[in-house]
């Protein structure tokens, strides 16, 4: 749950001005790494070219039967939430094919909570991205 009041957001917005940057959505498959050094270089390179990451987009693959595979996928998605936050992206878009299992829904709910703690909006997109 956000601790920033609506009036605080409005007050901040009143002082905003346009920036000469283009928002971009980064496809997670295009990230070579989510290591901080790589993300720092990527963020600097994008800024130098006039781009600001607005979102990181990915597909969730929870179709595996085994607990270990589901845990690996949850770990990968958590890493992408951290990457989105590090890059300054305001949201992570997660495409989910079909109706996820109960375990996948639990993992997605935990991911949404993590995103909230990291200051990133979690957006679930139904179907393949």
Language-model segment annotations:
Residues 65-129:
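Active-site acidic/histidine proton-transfer and metal-coordination neighborhood
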Residues 1-71, 75, 116:
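N-terminal pre-domain/capping segments
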């Amino acid at each position: 749950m956000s601790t920033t009041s609506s009036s605080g957001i409005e007050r901040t917005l009143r002082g905003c001005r346009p920036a000469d940057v283009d928002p971009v959505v980064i496809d997670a498959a295009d990230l070579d790494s989510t290591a901080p050094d790589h993300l720092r270089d990527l963020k600097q390179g994008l800024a130098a070219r006039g781009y600001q990451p607005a979102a990181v987009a990915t597909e969730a693959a929870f179709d595996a039967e085994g607990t270990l595979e589901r845990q690996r996928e949850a770990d990968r998605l958590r890493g992408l939430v951290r990457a989105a936050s590090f890059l300054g992206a305001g949201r992570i878009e997660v495409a989910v094919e079909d109706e996820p299992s109960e375990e996948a829904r639990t993992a997605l709910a935990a991911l949404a909570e993590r995103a909230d703690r990291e200051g990133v909006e979690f957006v679930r997109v139904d179907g393949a991205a």
